[in-house]
Amino acid sequence: YAGVNFLKNIASMNDWIVVHDAVRPCVSQIALERLWDIGSKEPDGAILAIPVSDTLKLGLADKEQNDPTSVYIKKTENREYYWLAQTPQMFKVELLLDVFQGKTFSFTDEASAVESIGKKPRLIQGERKNIKITTPDDLKIAENWQLKEEGVTAGHNMRIGQGFDVHKFGNEGKFVILGGVKI
């Protein structure tokens, strides 16, 4: 809120604020341009997001066990309308000021705060490589994406070369056996 509040003194109420998590360093220029091109026409703002592709299960904790990993499937959700929110997320200064004005928050992102006042931010197709790095495994995945972008195969020190080989035919006959076939 402090950043948005600061901007009210130097920005127009119609200016856009683009909020981005530092833990998502793999956002591409293409995704940013898509967000801006589509999102800047949306009065309720917009966010990058990707559709859920895995089967989505609603878990139910086993209350008899005192173990947070003891979770069972309550039901399988229809993933058709579920998306995974990403950043950047973009909103007009005025909208975010209205949302944050004098409230205490328990929101996980700006979009959910905007939703809380009845607005409907637009979902803009993001990219899977725009991963949120919160675990060591996430960091490895992000590094692999970066290596792929640079044209390097992760974990391999590969070199490609070209050569040739010349041999004299023996006196036994004028043929060669290649792949088990007499030529």
Ranges and model annotations:
Residues 1-14:
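Short phosphate-binding loop-to-helix
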Residues 11-23:
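Short beta-strand-to-loop acidic/aromatic patch adjacent to the donor-nucleotide binding site
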Residues 14, 59-71, 111-112, 164-180:
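Acidic-glycine-rich active-site phosphate/pyrophosphate-binding loop
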Residues 19, 49, 163:
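Generic enzyme active-site microenvironment
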Residues 26-124:
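Conserved core of the sugar-phosphate nucleotidyltransferase
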Residues 121-126, 131-134:
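Conserved active-site beta-strand element of glycosyltransferases/polysaccharide synthases
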Residues 143-159, 163-182:
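N-terminal extracellular/periplasmic Venus flytrap/periplasmic-binding protein-like
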